[in-house]
Each structure stands twice: as structure tokens, then as C-alpha cells.
UniProtKB/Swiss-Prot annotation:
This is ATP-dependent helicase/nuclease subunit A. The heterodimer acts as both an ATP-dependent DNA helicase and an ATP-dependent, dual-direction single-stranded exonuclease. Recognizes the chi site generating a DNA molecule suitable for the initiation of homologous recombination. The AddA nuclease domain is required for chi fragment generation; this subunit has the helicase and 3' -> 5' nuclease activities. Residues 497-804 form the UvrD-like helicase C-terminal domain. Its cofactor is Mg(2+). Heterodimer of AddA and AddB/RexB. The keyword Ligase does not apply. Keywords: ATP-binding, DNA damage, DNA repair, DNA-binding, Exonuclease, Helicase, Hydrolase, Isomerase, Nuclease, Nucleotide-binding. ATP binds at A33, A34, A35, G36, S37, G38, K39, T40. It comes from Bacillus cereus (strain AH820). Belongs to the helicase family. AddA subfamily.
Length: 1240
């Protein structure tokens, strides 16, 4: 009970609501945690309190903590570990706390998929699945689906008298392909798998079309649309009421009033019918008749008011006309006939989906693979069984988990789906009033509906639970925001109090939902939120595409100007670490976009202004010239009859034909493919002037034949390396600008092929299809780049990527871009509640029209899209800590402002439903909201009017401005002073310096650098160099300590007889340890075969291969450490890293400025992840035996001391990047098979 909960300690940092969330117990608890409210800290504190509870302590492995990402799970473990270590400092003798620390790595703190995997691994025998299964690659999964579906459809086409199937094909495919039908089957399969019982959902979908003995009033689609009809009639009626008010003004068109009142009476009739039934509305719509407006002499009245009255009435009439045409032009029974006609076709479609699901599951089972939806469904299958009434109930395994888990805690609960909810339900107590489920989230930040997240689960509980938790679950609101300034919070509240409601938005933005100030900031200048609306220029080329390009350019230019001005002026932001204000830096800025198409243009504009910028574009890899050329080579190897790829290869540096030579070749055979023409040309004797062309083509033709033969017999990865080597293309691109990057791109292609070969597919043709599917899904890979915390750049990212992050200054751009409604335009629509909806198509009569189900689903999806976009906007606005700047571009600002002002004097906080539901972009919500605030008066010059005081005078500060696009694109004027200097230079005259700045020029010329000490130390160091800095002078000549890596190259002839150097031998051994296949047996024969392969791939020279002592490599894998490598969960080898390190740590003699950092780079030989943590291994090939009189025991402390700094830096790099401690650091010496565990 509540009275038994621990009281909040005196002076506690926790708010009352946070403390309640930490200690509340005895029932299911839902914590609605607003942005920046410290939910993770609360969650960690709750777990700690449970673990160290004096009366009833809970072991950490008796808690199930479900997070949204693996990174969040690791962060949670780290925080819990740090908190337990602090407790241990106060209670060093506590065996319980020590036990919890030892249990932490085994605790169930993970994503839902990791928990599912744990359940499946433990109870795989209850499923028809190989316990050695692997997680399928997404593209591999797509290709498997394609294969299975092709086989099913081919069978169906081959069945005689398959009438219903061919009816399905006629209705939903084109003359050219059945792609649309395939998309339907796959979409239905995917949607069904988002439900706990996929088959049951599919059956309900068919049942909805069985209308035998039903009237239209019985249909769920009609019931939903009837609510929408009421909404639209109400909107239209509001237009007439507004028109009537205007007509009644002193200079309004009074003769219009009689007609407008008749219109109101008509809407009264229609609305009454809508409250009765569909049939009533249908009949009322047939009798709609509009009175003709009386003629008036417009000069007798205010012309603007007359126009407004007439426009409002026309809008109302258009709303009714739209309803008549869409819904009430057909008799109710005709809609029922559509359902009857489509029922058998839909039944066949669902049957195909079920067959597909069954065969797809079987194929995955045969290949020993599962996907992420399988993990959820397999877990659910283990945790549930069917009751007598056909419903799902907990299985014996589920009951075991219920007994095991004292509490289940779910983070980001708003992003849970139906299947995940069922899994959680089966491992927690049944009763909400006595439950053990603790859920944390913010439904206002639920932005993953496209991943089938279901915010309705959160909303349902939020409405059902009470703050007292009496008779059911308890809800706790964490509304205090500890992230942002008052100006950001009040600005966000002001907008969302007006746009987010239950009818439109799915959530009431009431007093409980409002953000409340929790952070304290010093007084700041220019902290008001801003809305900058850009008026596009008048002349736009290239239609809509050109307009989009210009919008991006305008917004980028404006943001660049603002960022530069803020940095140059020393705009200050608060630094919590120093508890003081400091000048803003580039890394304090972020530009948020709904999606990334504008990002390249924004980056380009910022770079032109000298602003460092970064965006993870994740595109461009396959567009890179070197990758594109190689992909064309592989397309030609697969099928040389493809003209475009072959022409591209012939024209590339690989063959090197110029345009004239290509034309000459084509002239030799105007018919047939390029390949046929090339083959024919090579058979004849060339003319003298064609000899060079002949030689080029003959060289390439012979290579191509060899590659095609090799591709049929050898692995794809070997083929790729063979092509790289025989063409010399890999070395060629290395000599081009950005050569290292180009070679890295080619290595990535090789790695992709290796990954592909690890799947169930083989062969070049399928690999090319594999890549095509990656591109079709839009999964092109960008160049990887790791950003350090200290990198001073402006970041550009999507709003989705920004979730959970915070920045001092936030620009939200592209607010005038239209919402993406493409999903609503599809030929068929799917919905979790309403099932399937498509056009009615009669191929015989060649007619098609919209059905009732399609209209209902489209309307429902539109309202859900509106709600999702509101939540996305909320996430964007709540990322800002100190300054929020909103930017959008419109084509005609005057016209848009008229529209936005339409609801300005609305008497309630919440804007009218039709204004919010009718929005096509974010500006359609933001601008009407801000135009009701006093801070927009300088722009509007309209006065308060009848806007309520609490809205007009709301405690928030805004700057609202319309920016002329022409001024942004105009070139910047050259300053007069600069112009004079330029003129003097052009005429080769002496530059005038008799000015106020003469002394400044002298001072600059005589200036000495303040931090001269820093110039004598390098800003970038390798780990090896730092290690040498720490070595004493006496020991610096011990060559056996030094570890050198050299590039792989053949030794010059004059050195051949001298044998390999120590460094070259070390490099060779390291190369073998990097590339040895750990999945194969480690034997002499296998290793020798792999070393030979490395020589073929030019990873080793012949000389190096001969020097490798294979038995020493085997000795390592026979050692305890080597066996741990083979048994590890994961093994990473030759891991490069860079990190920032305090200069004092790198240089013992550092005398420079405190706080300076240097960039450290290095390569970690090997790291292994085991159940209880990470171990770091560094391989050494130095000669030790015979070097020390006392043997290895004498050498050990010397070697350990010499390498301690090096391994400490490696460990620090790993811990920073992985956010996970390194448990052990090992040196392995091949000479003598020795292991040294390096301690701090």
C-alpha cells in the first residue's frame, strides 16, 4: 500500500513524482515521462532500490529490464554497475552488493529480441527449429521471400480452371507483370506478423467481407465513416456560421444573411440524419438544394468582407459536394454488393498469404535461419498455449518466468507492438491491481508506427490507470523537464496546447501533459524561440523539382547566416560542467530534418560559408565511380550480352577505350550486342589503324573468359580479388585523389561478398540480385565516419535520429514541406483494425471505383499519419536546450497567412478540428498557433481582437518573421573599404595603411604564438610512439620490444639474400592471425592452404609465407588463451581506432596549456567478447628465449612494464567506443608460447 512506501529523504534531488516512480509498488505502474524528465535515472534508481532493499532485497537477475536498443541496454547495465560500486564504497563488506555486481553481466537487461533469443535458446526443443540457427540478413530474407513467392505463383498459374486465382490476377495485376499481386501478398504477410495470432487476423479480414444477411449499418467501415461525415458537416457548418457573423457586420453584405440562415437549417437536417444512420444521410443528401444568393451592389458593402462571405459559403458547399460524390452518390446496397463480389477473391488472396507464410517458414527452417519477427513469434509460442475457448493463455514455461521475475521493467513502452505486449503479458502477473509490470515512456514521442509500434497500447493504459492506483494500475506523470530553458518549454507548450487533442492527435495535451520547468539557467540574451517563414522567389525554374531545390537552398543560406552570426558575435550558452556561460561552438548546433533529401544541399551551403558540418547520409557508396565500374565488370562476367555495363567497362580505365574507339567497334556490327560485335571483331585481322584497339579488346576478352570460368568454380570473394589483381584497378584507384578512400570502398565490396557467402546464397548472379535489392530498399551505404565528442561541427540529422539527444541550439528546417502521404495513394491499403481495402475493379466491364473499405481505411490512416507527424514535431522541438529556431519556406506568404489567420480568433485553446486535420505541413500547425500570440503583432498588425487573454498573453517569447527569399539569394555587397584595397592592388599601387588599423597591423606582424610549447609536440601520435615516450633512455635500444608494421611488398632483389627483417616477419605473422579462418580446424594442412590463399590475394609475399612458423600459430590456438578465442561469443581482429587523450598523459615532459588534447591512433590485434566481458590480446613476435639469463621469469616484469602504457591505451579506446569495461589485457609471445596478463 502507498503508506508503506519509503519516504523521500530530506534534501533529495528527486521530485515528488520521480520519487513515487522510484518506490511505488504492488500493482502495474505506467510512468508517462515527458521529454527531458530524467526517466532513465528514475529507472536505474528504482532497480538499485530493489536490489539493496534492506527488508526484501531482489537479486538483479530476478529483474527483466526491456530496452528499445542494445546501446540503451548497455548504458543501463553501466549505470547500474556504477551505482552498485558507489554503494560498495559505503558498504565495503556487503557480500550482497558484490554478488549483484557479479550477476550483472548475466542479468536480463536487453532488448525484447535479445530476451526472445534467450527464451528460444533455452527451450528450442519445444519448437521445430535447429538450435544452431542464425539471424537472417534482411536482404537475404527478401530474396528468399521472392523465391518462395515465385514458386507459389508459378504453381497457381499452372492449375487448370483456377478461376478465382485468375480473377484475382485480372483485378490486381497489370498486363506487364504481377508485381502488384506480389506486393499485396508480402504486405499482408508482414502486417499479419505484427499480431499475436497472424492466421486469426487474416481470417477476420476475410470475415469482414462476408456481408450475407447484413445491412450497411452493420459494417464497421460505415460506422467509422459516419463519424467522419459528422466531422466534415461540422466543419462546413462552421464556415457558414463564420460567413453569417461577417455578413452581420456594419459594412457586411446583410442581404446574404437570409440565404446563410437557410444553409444553417440545411446543415441542421444533414447533421441530424448523420446521428441516425447511413441510410438517413443518403436520403438527406439526395434532397440537398442550395438557395441562390441574392444579387447585391458590391460597392454598397465592404468588398473584402463580401469576398470572404462568398468564399466561406463556397467552401461549405464544396465539403458537401465532396461527401455526395465520394459516399452518397450510390445506394447503400450497392456498397454491400461490392463486398459480396470481392469476398471470394479476397479469400483466395488470404489463402495465398497463408501458403506463402508456411513455405517461407519451412525454407528458413531448412536453412537454419530466423528473422526478428520469428524471434517474437517463437518466444510467444513457447510462452503460450491455447485454452479451451481458443484463446491464448500462459504456458508452463511462462509460469516459470513469472515465478522467476520479481518485476518486469519496460523502457520506451510507447514503441511496443502487439506481439511484444503479449510476450510481456505472459511473463508478468495477470492482475493490473496486483501486478509487477513497470512501464516507462512518452506516448507524445511515439514515432515508430512505420515499424508497427502501437501507441494505442500506452494510451489505453494511460486512460485506464489512475494516479492513486485504486482498483487497477497506477499512472505517474513526470512532466518536469530538466533539459531546456523556460523559453523552449513555454514555446513548445504554446503550440501543442493548440494542436494536439484526442480527436485529432490521439492525445490530450492537457495540464498533466504540459512540459514543466525543472532546469535552472542563468539569464541569457536572445533566447526567445523563433519562426522564420521564407517567401520563395518569384521565378523558379524546373517546376516542382526546381522549387524544392530552391527551398533547400534558401533555408540553408538563412541557417548558415544565423550560425555564422551567432558564432562570430560570441553568442553564449550555458556549460553545466563549468557552471558558467561560454561562447557557442559549432558542435552546439544541430539542424533537424524530417528526412534527408535536403541534407547534401544544406551541407554544401554551410561549407561554402566556412562552417564545418557533418551528416550521416548513408548514401553514395554504390554511386562511387570505382564501385560502379567494378559492379559493371561483375555484371558483364555474369552476362556479357548486357550492352550498357559492357560499354561502361570498355570506356573505363580498365580497358581504356575512348569515344572514337567505342564508335569504331560499334561500326563493325550495327546489329547484335556489343559483346557479339567484340567477339566478331577479334576473330578477324585488324587494320593497321585498329591494331591498338584490337590489342586492348583482346587483352580484356581473354581476361573475361578466364573470369567467367573462374566464377563457375570458385568463390565470389576470390573472384573479386582476382579481378582486382589482374586488372590492376585496385592499385590504380589508390593513385587517384582520395585513393585510400577509393581502395577502402573496393575492400568493402569484397567484404560484402564475404558476408553474402555466409548466407544461404551462392554465386555471382544472386549476389548481383542481392545488391539490387539493397538499392531497391534504399539501403545504400555511406562512407563510414566516426565522430568524436570533441569534433566541432554542425550536425545535420533526421528528427528520428535525434530522439533521446539534446543540443543547445536547434534549427528545425523544412517545415513547409508537405507530409508524405504516398502510402494513402496505394492501390490497396491495410490497417490493423480495418483489414484490407482496395478499389473495386471489374476487368470485364473495365471499370474501377473506390470502395467503402478503402475510403474508411484511407481516412483512418490519414488521421493516424496526422497524429504521428504531431509527435514527430514534438520530438523535434524538445531537443533544444536553450534556443529553438523553426524555419519553413512557402510559395506565397500572403496567401498562406490568410489561410493561417482563418482560425485566429477561435475562442478555445485547441484550434478547430478541421484546421488541425487539414494540415499538409508543419507550418499549417505552427503558424496558426503563433499568430494568436501577442509576439506576432509586429508582423500582423491586427491587434488582439477576440482572442482570449490567456492565449494572446501566454507567458512565452517568440520572434515571428517573414524573410524575403530574394534577399537571401542576392550576392553579398563588397564593403567599401575592401573595394578600395582591391582597386589599389589591381593598379599595383601602394596599399593605403594610414588608418586606425595601422597599429593593429603592426601588432599582428610582430605577434608571437602564446602556446609555443605545444608546437614542439605532435597533435597526433600513434600508440607505439607514446609507448616509446614512456620508455627510459637505458632501455630504448631493446629492439625486441618494438612492434613495427610495414606495408606488404616484394623485397628488392639486392636484399633478397639477406632474409626477412624482424619487422617483416612480425608483419607476416600478424597478417596470418588477422585472416586465419576460426571456423575451420586449426591444423598444419588448413593453415598452409590459407597462407597460400593469402599469397594469391597479395596479402603476403612468397618470402613472408615461407618464413611463417605454422606450428607456433597452432601452439597459440592450443593454449588456454587460444581456446578462449575459438570459444568466444565474438572475435574482432586488427581493430583500428582513434581517440582524444589529454596531452599530460601522452607526454611526460608536457609544459603546455592544461586541458589540451592530442589525437591518438592505433590498431588492436585482437579483442574477444565472452560472457563476463571483453579481453584484449596483443601478439608479439619478438625473440625472448636466450635473451635473459633468468629466462622468462626475469623477462616477464620487464616486458609487462614496457607494454603497460600501450595496452592501457588500447583498453581505454575500447571502453570509450563500446561503453563496456575491458576485464583483461594479455600479451602473447609466439617465442616460447608465453602469456602475460598486464595489470594496471
Amino acid at each position: 500500500m502507498i503508506e508503506n512506501w519509503p519516504k523521500k529523504p530530506e534534501g533529495s534531488q528527486w521530485t515528488d513524482d520521480q520519487w513515487k516512480a522510484v518506490v511505488a509498488n504492488g500493482r502495474d505502474i505506467l510512468v508517462a515521462a515527458a521529454a527531458g524528465s530524467g526517466k532513465t535515472a528514475v529507472l536505474v534508481e528504482r532497480i538499485i532500490k530493489k536490489i539493496i532493499n534492506e527488508e526484501n532485497p531482489v537479486d538483479v537477475d530476478r529483474l527483466l529490464v526491456v530496452t528499445f536498443t542494445n546501446a540503451a541496454a548497455q548504458e543501463m547495465k553501466n549505470r547500474i554497475g556504477e551505482a552498485l560500486e558507489k554503494v560498495l564504497i559505503d558498504e565495503p563488506g556487503s557480500q550482497h552488493v558484490r554478488k549483484q555486481l557479479s550477476l550483472l553481466n548475466k542479468a536480463s537487461i536487453s532488448t525484447i529480441h535479445s530476451f526472445c533469443l534467450q527464451v528460444i535458446r533455452g527451450y528450442y526443443y519445444m519448437l521445430d527449429v535447429d538450435p544452431r540457427f542464425r539471424i537472417a540478413n534482411q536482404t537475404e530474407n527478401e530474396l528468399l521471400k521472392e523465391e518462395v513467392l515465385d514458386d507459389i505463383l508459378e504453381e497457381e498459374y499452372g492449375i487448370e480452371d483456377n478461376t478465382i486465382f485468375f480473377e484475382l490476377v485480372d483485378r490486381y495485376t497489370s498486363d506487364r507483370s504481377d508485381d502488384d499481386l506480389q506486393r499485396m501478398i508480402l504486405a499482408l504477410h508482414t502486417e499479419s506478423r505484427a499480431h499475436p495470432n497472424p492466421e486469426k487476423w487474416l481470417d477476420k479480414l476475410v470475415e469482414a467481407y462476408d456481408v450475407e444477411g447484413k445491412t450497411i449499418e452493420d459494417l464497421v467501415y460505415a460506422s467509422y465513416l459516419l463519424e467522419d461525415v459528422k466531422f466534415q458537416l461540422e466543419t462546413a457548418e462552421q464556415h457558414i456560421r463564420k460567413a453569417t457573423e461577417l455578413a452581420m457586420l456594419p459594412d457586411g453584405p446583410a442581404p446574404r444573411i437570409e440565404t446563410l440562415q437557410a444553409d444553417l437549417a440545411l446543415f441542421g437536417t444533414l447533421s441530424a440524419a448523420a446521428r441516425e444512420s447511413w441510410t438517413s444521410v443518403y436520403e438527406a443528401m439526395q434532397n440537398v438544394s442550395w438557395q441562390t444568393l441574392k444579387r447585391i451592389k458590391k460597392s454598397d458593402y465592404n468588398e473584402d468582407i463580401v469576398k470572404q462571405v462568398d468564399s466561406l459559403r463556397n467552401k461549405a458547399k464544396d465539403e458537401v459536394k465532396k461527401l455526395q460524390e465520394e459516399l452518397f452518390s450510390r445506394r447503400p446496397e450497392s456498397f454491400l454488393r461490392d463486398f459480396q463480389d470481392m469476398h471470394p477473391v479476397l479469400e483466395k488472396l488470404v489463402q495465398l498469404v497463408k501458403v506463402f507464410t508456411e513455405r517461407f517458414q519451412a525454407m528458413k527452417r531448412d536453412k537454419g535461419m530466423v528473422d526478428f519477427t520469428d524471434l517474437e513469434h517463437f518466444c510467444l509460442q513457447i510462452l503460450s498455449e491455447q485454452s479451451e475457448d481458443g484463446e491464448m493463455k500462459p504456458s508452463a514455461v511462462a509460469l516459470q518466468y513469472r515465478n522467476k521475475f520479481a518485476e518486469v521493467l519496460v523502457d520506451e513502452y510507447q514503441d511496443t507492438n502487439f506481439v511484444q505486449e503479449s510476450i510481456i503479458k505472459f511473463v508478468t502477473k495477470d492482475s493490473e491491481s496486483e501486478g509487477n509490470l513497470f512501464m516507462v515512456g512518452d506516448v507524445k514521442q511515439s514515432i515508430y508506427r512505420f515499424r508497427l509500434a502501437e501507441p494505442g497500447l500506452f494510451l489505453g493504459k494511460y486512460k485506464r490507470f489512475t494516479q492513486e492506483g485504486l482498483g487497477g494500475g497506477m499512472k505517474i506523470d513526470l512532466a518536469k523537464n530538466f533539459r531546456s530553458r523556460h523559453e523552449v518549454l513555454a514555446g513548445t507548450n504554446f503550440i501543442f496546447k493548440q494542436i494536439m487533442g484526442e480527436e485529432v492527435g490521439e492525445i490530450d495535451y492537457d495540464a498533466d501533459a504540459e512540459l514543466k520547468l525543472g532546469a535552472s539557467y542563468p539569464e541569457g540574451e536572445d533566447v526567445a524561440a523563433e519562426l522564420l517563414c521564407i517567401q520563395q522567389t518569384e521565378e523558379v525554374i524546373d517546376g516542382e523539382e526546381g522549387a524544392e531545390v530552391e527551398k533547400a537552398q534558401l533555408e540553408a543560406r538563412l541557417m548558415a547566416q544565423r550560425i555564422k552570426a551567432m558564432v562570430d558575435s560570441g553568442y553564449e550558452v550555458y556549460d553545466r560542467k563549468t557552471d558558467s556561460m561560454r561562447p557557442v561552438q559549432y558542435r552546439d548546433f544541430v539542424i533537424l530534418l524530417r528526412s534527408m533529401p535536403w541534407a547534401p544541399q544544406i551541407m554544401e551551403e554551410l561549407k561554402l560559408q566556412g562552417i564545418p558540418v557533418y551528416a550521416d547520409l548513408a548514401t553514395g557508396y554504390f554511386e562511387a565511380t570505382e564501385v560502379n565500374i567494378m559492379m559493371n565488370v561483375f555484371r558483364v562476367i555474369d552476362n556479357p550480352m548486357q550492352d550498357i555495363p559492357l560499354a561502361a567497362v570498355l570506356r573505363s580505365p580498365i580497358v581504356g577505350l575512348n569515344d572514337e574507339e567505342l564508335a569504331t567497334l560499334r561500326a563493325h556490327g550495327k546489329k547484335g550486342s556489343f559483346y557479339e560485335v567484340m567477339s566478331s571483331f577479334l576473330k578477324g585481322a585488324p587494320l593497321e589503324e585498329e591494331k591498338e584497339l584490337h590489342d586492348k579488346l583482346e587483352w580484356f576478352y581473354n581476361l573475361l573468359q578466364g573470369w567467367r570460368e573462374f566464377a563457375r568454380q570458385q568463390s565470389l570473394s576470390d573472384l573479386i580479388w582476382k579481378v582486382y589483381g589482374e586488372t590492376g584497378y585496385y592499385d590504380f584507384v589508390g593513385g587517384l585523389p582520395a585513393g585510400k578512400q577509393r581502395q577502402a570502398n573496393l575492400r568493402v565490396l569484397y567484404d560484402r561478398a564475404r558476408q553474402y557467402e555466409a548466407t544461404s546464397f551462392r554465386g555471382l548472379f544472386r549476389f548481383l540480385r542481392f545488391i539490387e535489392r539493397i538499392l531497391e530498399r534504399g539501403d545504400d551505404m555511406g562512407t563510414a565516419r566516426a565522430l568524436g565528442e570533441q569534433e566541432d561541427v554542425v550536425r545535420i540529422m533526421t528528427i528520428h535520429k535525434s530522439k533521446g539527444l539534446e543540443f543547445p541550439v536547434v534549427f528545425v528546417a523544412g517545415l513547409g514541406r508537405r507530409f508524405n502521404t504516398q502510402d494513402l495513394m496505394k492501390r490497396f491499403l491495410l490497417h490493423k483494425d480495418f483489414g484490407f481495402g482496395s478499389q473495386f475493379i471489374d476487368p470485364r466491364k473495365r471499370i474501377k471505383y473506390t470502395t467503402l473499405s478503402q475510403l474508411a481505411i484511407k481516412r483512418k490512416m490519414k488521421m493516424e499519419l496526422i497524429a504521428e507527424e504531431m509527435r514527430v514535431l514534438y520530438v523535434a522541438l524538445t531537443r533544444a536546450k536553450e534556443k529553438l529556431i523553426l524555419i519553413g519556406t512557402v510559395k506565397d506568404a500572403t496567401k498562406e497567412m490568410e489561410k493561417w489567420l482563418d482560425a485566429r480568433e477561435h475562442s478555445e485553446w485547441l484550434l478547430p478540428d478541421h484546421v488541425r486535420a487539414g494540415a499538409s505541413c508543419y507550418l499549417d500547425w505552427i503558424a496558426p498557433s503563433l499568430y494568436r500570440h501577442r509576439d506576432s503583432e509586429m508582423l500582423l498588425e491586427l491587434g488582439q481582437g477576440s482572442i482570449p487573454d490567456e492565449i494572446y498573453g501566454y507567458d512565452t517569447s517568440w520572434k515571428v518573421e517573414v524573410v524575403d527569399g530574394n534577399t537571401l539569394l542576392a550576392p553579398e555587397p563588397v564593403q567599401e573599404e575592401k573595394q578600395e584595397l582591391l582597386e589599389a592592388l589591381r593598379e599595383k599601387k601602394a596599399v593605403p595603411l594610414e588608418s586606425e588599423r595601422k597599429e593593429e597591423v603592426y601588432d599582428r606582424l610582430m605577434w608571437k604564438y602564446r602556446y609555443g610549447e605545444a608546437t614542439s609536440h605532435r597533435a597526433k601520435q600513434s600508440v607505439t610512439e607514446i609507448k616509446r615516450n614512456y620508455q627510459s633512455e637505458e632501455g630504448s635500444d631493446n629492439a625486441f620490444i618494438k612492434k613495427l608494421r610495414a606495408p606488404i611488398r616484394t623485397r628488392p632483389r639486392f636484399m633478397e639474400k639477406k632474409g626477412l627483417t624482424y619487422a617483416e616477419r612480425g608483419t607476416a605473422v600478424h597478417a596470418v592471425m588477422q585472416h586465419v579462418d576460426l571456423k575451420k580446424p586449426i591444423t598444419v594442412e588448413v593453415l598452409q592452404e590459407q597462407i597460400a590463399g593469402m599469397v594469391n590475394k597479395e596479402l603476403l609475399t612468397f618470402e613472408q609465407a615461407e618464413e611463417i612458423a605454422v606450428e607456433k600459430v597452432i601452439s597459440f590456438f592450443d593454449s588456454d588463451l587460444g581456446k578462449r578465442v575459438l570459444a568466444a561469443k565474438s572475435v574482432e581482429r586488427e581493430v583500428p581506432f582513434t581517440m582524444m587523450l589529454a596531452a599530460e598523459e601522452a607526454y611526460q615532459d608536457w609544459q603546455g596549456k592544461s586541458g589540451e588534447s592530442i589525437l591518438v591512433q592505433g590498431v588492436i590485434d585482437c579483442m574477444i567478447e565472452e560472457e563476463d566481458g571483453i579481453t584484449l590480446i596483443d601478439f608479439k613476435t619478438d625473440t625472448i628465449e636466450g635473451k635473459f639469463p633468468g629466462g622468462f621469469e626475469q623477462a616477464k616484469p620487464i616486458l609487462e612494464e614496457r607494454y603497460k602504457v600501450q595496452l592501457s591505451l588500447y583498453a581505454k579506446a575500447l571502453e570509450k567506443s563500446l561503453q563496456h569495461p575491458v576485464k583483461e589485457k594479455c600479451l602473447y609471445f609466439f617465442d616460447g608460447n608465453h602469456v602475460i596478463k598486464v595489470e594496471e
